[in-house]
Amino acid sequence: MKFTKMHGLGNDYIYVDAISQKIENPNEISKFVSDRHFGIGSDGLVLILPSDVADFKMRMFNSDGSEAEMCGNAIRCVGKFVYDKKMTDKSTITIETLAGIKVLEMTIENGKVVLVKVDMGEPILKAEEIPVLSEKHPVIDEEITAKDYCYNFTCVSMGNPHAITYIENVDEFPLEKIGPLFEIHEKFPRKTNVEFVELIDKNTVKMRVWERGAGETLACGTGACAVLTASVLKGYVGRKATVKLLGGDLTIEWNEFDKHIYMTGPATTVFEGEIDI
């Protein structure tokens, strides 16, 4: 299997052109290639496929083999993958995902993609569509307790579920201990990604994320979009802000007119290779 390892702010996946080569059993392949000791090492596997409704289709799998709806960091890399490999000559393309069709605008320098702006669509705020078991609409400051820990969560879906709460010092927070308790909480029928956020100023927030099925990652694009949404709903930031993640910064904007979330950030190729599977 030919592959390319890429990352968006350290959120790394193995990217495979599944148009020119047939890939069977991607769930097991993802578990194998993701292993950082016995495989290639990644947060998961991304397949680029043909689409009947968009320029390309992406399917993505977490390191535990489960399929995910969407990943903001991964979709930026898909844009770079197809452009840099001359699978398209367009700087604006559409990608079919399990969370709908996304539009990518790519910034090109010296024939290569350096930045990708993604129209992530409208955030989903209805409890049953996120999904979260709550009577609130939107779900702002839903008090949830797991073991001895209690937080007020604001819940948003960007095609995948996110629960966001605000704390004083995100760097010192014991995420590995507390994140998984809320990921699998009964309030979330399909589990959830969990974001812990520190407010820096009206234009900047800092976050760490416990990703559903992957644990802590260096960055989560949909998580950054959900955090911006929650922060606007709570009046903490304006409609455009910098979201600081462990792997770097993303610029997120909640457009006032079309109500869509736009995410801008880098995409990086690490190396290419072949592996027997």
Swiss-Prot record:
NCBIfam families xrefs: DapF (TIGR00652)
Keyword presence, Lipid metabolism: no
Listed pathway(s): Amino-acid biosynthesis; L-lysine biosynthesis via DAP pathway; DL-2,6-diaminopimelate from LL-2,6-diaminopimelate: step 1/1
S-S bridge residues: none
Enzymatic class: isomerase
Known function: Catalyzes the stereoinversion of LL-2,6-diaminopimelate (L,L-DAP) to meso-diaminopimelate (meso-DAP), a precursor of L-lysine.
InterPro entries: DAP_epimerase_AS (IPR018510), DAP_epimerase_DapF (IPR001653)
Lineage: Archaea, Methanobacteriati, Methanobacteriota, Methanomada group, Methanococci
Annotated HAMAP family: DAP_epimerase
Protein name (database record): Diaminopimelate epimerase
GO biological process terms held by the UniProt record: lysine biosynthetic process via diaminopimelate
Subunit structure: Homodimer.
Family: Belongs to the diaminopimelate epimerase family.
UniProt keywords, alphabetically: Amino-acid biosynthesis, Cytoplasm, Isomerase, Lysine biosynthesis
Catalytic activity: (2S,6S)-2,6-diaminopimelate = meso-2,6-diaminopimelate
Residue numbers annotated as active site: C71, C220
GO molecular function, one term: diaminopimelate epimerase activity
Chain residues that bind substrate: N11, N62, G72, N73, N160, N193, E211, R212, G221, T222
Cellular component GO terms held in the UniProt record: cytosol
Site (Could be important to modulate the pK values of the two catalytic cysteine residues): H162, E211
The organism of origin for this protein: Methanococcus maripaludis (strain DSM 14266 / JCM 13030 / NBRC 101832 / S2 / LL)
Keyword Cytoplasm in annotation: yes
Annotated localization: Cytoplasm
EC number: 5.1.1.7
